[in-house]
C-alpha cells in the first residue's frame, strides 16, 4: 500500500515541488518544554504533521497537512478549543527514514509547547517513532499501513485508514474480477514499498489466479533491463506494483520500450500526483490512462460531511500545496481532517487538553449511542456538546468504527490515472474473499 510506503532515497525535484512552510496558518512557533501533555493555559494548541516532506515520499506530508489546515482554520473560526482560541498545524519532516525520524520526533516532543496530537507517522518511520509518541502520551493518527499495527498495544495510536495488507487483497479482487489469469508482482526492495506484497500474492492465488513472477527491485537504478526481460519472459496478464516514482518510471519505460506494456495495478502509494506524473511522463499519458488503476481507501465524494470538508478546504485553498484541487477527493487528506476534528472534539467533551484525559473520548465520540446527535465537523460537535448533548462524529471518510486496537477498517476504491475517479468500490466484507 502506500505503505505509506515508499523508498527512502532522495528525489529533490519532488521535494522542491511540494515545499511547504514549516509552520502554517501564520502562527509563530511555540516555546520549548520537556514533555507534551496538553495545556492548562490559554495559548495556542499544536497539532503536528509528522510525515515525510522531503525524499521520495515527500508528497505524504503535504497530503496530511492539507487535512490539518482546513480543520484548524474551522476550529479557530468556531472559537477554538476550551480556553485556547488558536490552533496551530506544525510540520515535522521525518524524511521517510527512521534514522532521521527518531531525532526529529524527539525534538518535536521536547520543543513543541502544547502538542496535543499528531498526524502520522507514515510506514516509512512508524515502527521507530510510534513508541516515542506513545511514551510521551501524545495521540497520533497514523497513516502507516503496516500490518504490525493491526493489533498493537499502543494506547495513543489510532488509525482510520485501512492497513496495507487489506490494500493487497483489494488489488487481487479487482484483478480477478477483470479476468486476469496470471500476474507478476513488481515491488521496490525497501520495506515500506512491500506492505501490500504478501497479501496481493496470497490473495490472488486464493481466488484462482497464478503468480508467475515476484520481483523486489533495487531502487533508483539507471536501468532495469535484466528485470524487465524476466518479466516479459514470464508473460503475466497484469502487473501488481509499488515503488517510488523514479524507480517505477524507469522500470515501466523499459517495459514500454520493449513493446510489452500492459495492465498494471498499483497500491495507494501509486495514486499520488508525483508517482502518476513521473510514470505518465515515462510511458505516455494515454498509456497510463489505458493500462493503469490503483487501489486506495474509499472516501465518499458526495453527502453532507464531504460538502463540509470541501467548503472548509476551499476556504484555505491558498494555504495548501498546489493545486489545491488534488486534495479534494484524497482519502488521506480527508482522514487527516477527520482525525483533527475527533481529537479536538474529544478535548471539548473531556473538558481537558491533557491527552491522558481526553484520549478515551476519541473512541466514544465515533461510536453510535442511543440519542446521540450526529455531527459532521468541529463546529457542529462543539455546539452540541456545549448544550449537553451526546454526539457521534461521522466525518468526510464516513462512519469510523474502531476495533479494540483502535483501528477502523474501511472500504476500498479502485481509481483511474487521475488518482481520484473511481472505477470500482469494495467493502471490507467483499475483499475478505481474498483472505
Residues covered by each model-derived region:
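Extracytosolic ligand-binding ectodomains
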Residues: 2-9, 13-435
Amino acid at each position: 500500500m502506500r505503505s505509506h510506503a515508499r523508498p527512502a532515497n532522495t528525489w529533490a525535484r519532488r521535494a522542491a515541488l511540494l515545499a511547504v512552510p514549516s509552520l502554517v496558518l501564520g502562527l509563530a512557533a511555540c516555546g520549548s518544554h520537556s514533555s507534551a501533555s496538553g495545556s492548562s493555559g490559554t495559548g495556542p494548541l499544536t497539532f503536528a504533521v509528522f510525515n515525510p516532506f522531503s525524499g521520495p515520499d515527500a508528497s505524504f506530508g503535504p497530503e496530511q497537512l492539507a487535512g490539518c489546515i482546513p480543520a484548524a482554520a474551522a476550529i479557530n473560526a468556531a472559537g477554538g478549543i476550551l480556553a485556547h482560541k488558536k490552533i496551530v498545524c506544525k510540520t515535522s519532516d521525518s524524511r521517510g527514514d527512521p534514522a532521521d525520524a527518531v531525532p526529529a520526533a524527539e525534538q518535536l516532543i521536547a520543543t513543541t509547547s502544547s502538542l496535543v496530537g499528531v498526524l502520522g507517522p507514515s510506514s516509512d518511520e512508524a515502527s521507530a517513532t510510534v513508541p516515542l509518541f506513545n511514551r510521551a502520551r501524545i495521540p497520533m493518527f497514523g497513516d502507516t499501513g503496516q500490518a504490525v499495527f493491526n493489533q498493537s498495544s499502543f494506547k495513543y495510536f489510532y488509525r482510520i485508514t485501512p492497513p496495507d495488507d487489506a490494500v493487497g487483497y483489494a488489488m487481487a479482487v479487482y484483478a480477478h474480477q477483470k479476468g486476469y489469469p496470471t500476474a507478476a508482482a513488481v515491488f521496490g526492495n525497501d520495506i515500506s514499498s512491500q506492505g501490500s506484497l504478501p497479501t496481493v500474492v496470497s490473495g490472488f492465488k486464493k481466488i484462482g489466479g497464478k503468480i508467475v513472477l515476484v520481483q523486489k527491485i533495487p531502487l533508483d537504478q539507471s536501468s532495469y533491463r535484466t528485470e524487465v526481460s524476466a518479466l516479459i519472459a514470464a508473460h503475466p496478464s497484469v502487473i501488481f506494483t509499488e515503488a517510488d516514482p523514479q524507480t517505477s518510471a524507469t522500470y515501466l519505460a523499459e517495459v514500454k520500450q520493449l513493446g510489452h506494456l500492459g495492465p498494471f495495478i498499483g497500491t495507494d502509494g501509486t495514486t499520488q500526483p508525483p508517482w502518476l506524473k513521473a510514470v505518465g511522463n515515462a510511458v505516455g499519458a494515454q498509456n497510463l490512462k489505458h493500462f493503469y488503476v490503483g487501489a486506495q481507501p474509499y472516501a465518499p465524494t458526495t453527502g453532507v460531511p464531504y460538502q463540509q470538508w470541501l467548503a472548509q478546504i476551499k476556504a484555505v485553498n491558498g494555504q495548501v500545496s498546489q493545486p489545491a484541487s488534488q486534495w479534494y477527493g484524497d482519502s488521506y487528506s480527508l482522514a487527516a481532517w477527520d482525525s483533527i476534528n475527533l481529537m479536538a472534539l474529544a478535548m471539548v467533551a473531556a473538558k481537558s487538553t491533557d491527552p491522558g484525559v481526553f484520549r478515551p473520548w476519541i473512541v466514544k465520540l465515533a461510536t453510535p449511542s442511543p440519542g446521540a446527535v450526529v455531527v459532521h465537523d468541529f463546529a457542529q460537535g462543539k455546539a452540541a456538546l456545549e448544550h449537553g448533548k451526546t454526539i457521534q462524529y461521522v466525518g468526510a471518510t464516513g462512519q469510523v468504527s474502531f476495533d479494540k486496537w483502535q483501528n477502523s477498517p474501511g472500504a476500498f476504491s479502485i481509481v483511474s490515472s487521475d488518482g481520484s475517479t473511481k472505477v470500482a468500490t469494495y467493502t471490507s466484507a467483499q475483499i475478505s474473499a481474498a483472505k
